[in-house]
């Protein structure tokens, strides 16, 4: 279970564009109190709750995509 953070890289992109490993699946998306019927064309929004099922190391790799993108630092 992961909450899509504002500024996350996945926001606005269709689920079908995610290059998830074959062992990882999005099984549900909640928007507010509503369970949404989703498809590959569905785009995630901030505060969506995404239920993912997969291997632990694959999930660990993908979780940062649902979190806020790190601000780039100037040198």
Kindly give the residue locations of the regions a language model identified:
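Cytosolic Rossmann-like ligand/nucleotide-binding regulatory domains
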Residues: 1-68, 73-75
């Amino acid at each position: 279970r992961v909450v899509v953070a504002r500024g996350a890289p996945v926001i606005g992109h269709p689920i079908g564009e995610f290059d998830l490993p074959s062992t990882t699946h999005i099984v549900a998306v909640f928007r507010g109190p509503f369970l949404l019927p989703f498809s590959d064309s569905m785009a995630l929004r901030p505060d969506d709750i995404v239920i993912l099922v997969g291997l632990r190391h694959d999930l660990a790799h993908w979780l940062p995509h649902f979190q806020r993108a790190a601000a780039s630092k100037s040198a």
